[in-house]
Amino acid sequence: MATKFQKDLQKYAELAVRVGLNLRPGQRLLVRAPSPYGVAFEHAALIHYISEAAYKAGARYVDVIWGDEQTELIRFAHAPRDSFAEFPHWKLTAPLEYAERGDAILTIAATDPDLLAGQDPDLVNTYQETVWKVMNPYLVHGTSNTMNWCVISAARPGWAKKMFPKPDEEKAVANLWKTIFQMCRVDQADPIAA
């Protein structure tokens, strides 16, 4: 039997797909993160509910760009400095293809806010400038509304502890999920109608 959290997470996914994206039958769906790291593996349950909701709404195909922030930290610690002016173009290809086809893109904004704290600011700046330069052809589609797109959030320990510093990490994450669900009316009997 599903827990209350699992039921709320499922309603959140359905809300994102049906209302946020207004996914149409036959569209493909790409789920990604706003950062180049990809969607954190810890959000697999949410991704599963999103995929199910998308297919039930008539999605032709659902794809996810997964990632691992710790791998990026390892890069900052050990990669050659001149490598930060490089960015793999395949990370542009997928979202650009979806955007050009008029498909749907769901972005899960849940990056650790302190991930790059303590890193060389010049490297961070070079890295961010490179990412924005490469990703610009895709970003233009979002600002010109040529595709269905939506940004949602998901609770992560870093953000949870910033918003709820007093309780332990697990309780802070639970509080952040509760807040996200309340803000999106997931706590209502019918969040889609709310």
Where are these regions (language model features)?
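Active-site bordering "gate/hinge" segments
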Residues: 1-194
